[in-house]
Amino acid sequence: MSNVPAELKYSKEHEWLRKEADGTYTVGITEHAQELLGDMVFVDLPEVGATVSAGDDCAVAESVKAASDIYAPVSGEIVAVNDALSDSPELVNSEPYAGGWIFKIKASDESELESLLDATAYETLLEDE
């Protein structure tokens, strides 16, 4: 079973979301997602300043197996991207919940968070796959 940190929120598309002290949200892909994709070779990051809607594809994770869209779990403005992934995309594999984060977003509608899964619901989703 994949590691599913309890403090995070999750999407059905296997993104995770963590609220930061400054009110922004950090987004990445889950350990389960990176296990399915395999070794990362490139991450196409979104543009800082871009406005996205929940469910929009806004980044791409390319691995030795496939390229997979990464979706915005909430609507808002992209306020930062993880530039370290340009040189070290493997951080998505080795540290999916830490150094392998993909972007930070300032949510425009926090009520969208209610549609995300908590750790227990995400674990149930994984069991049903």
UniProtKB/Swiss-Prot annotation:
Listed GO biological process terms: glycine decarboxylation via glycine cleavage system
SUPFAM superfamilies noted in UniProt: Single hybrid motif (SSF51230)
CDD domains the record matches: GCS_H
Lipoyl-binding domain sequence ranges: 24-106
Disulfide bonds: none
Domain of life per record: Bacteria
Annotated cofactor note: Binds 1 lipoyl cofactor covalently.
Keywords in alphabetical order: Lipoyl
Stored InterPro entries: 2-oxoA_DH_lipoyl-BS, Biotin_lipoyl, GCV_H, GCV_H/Fam206, GCV_H_sub, Single_hybrid_motif
Names of required cofactors: (R)-lipoate
Keyword Transferase tagged: no
GO cellular component: cytosol; glycine cleavage complex
Keyword Membrane belongs to the record: no
Family named by the database record: Belongs to the GcvH family.
Subunit composition and interactions: The glycine cleavage system is composed of four proteins: P, T, L and H.
Its job: The glycine cleavage system catalyzes the degradation of glycine. The H protein shuttles the methylamine group of glycine from the P protein to the T protein.
Official protein name in the record: Glycine cleavage system H protein
Organism: Escherichia coli O139:H28 (strain E24377A / ETEC)
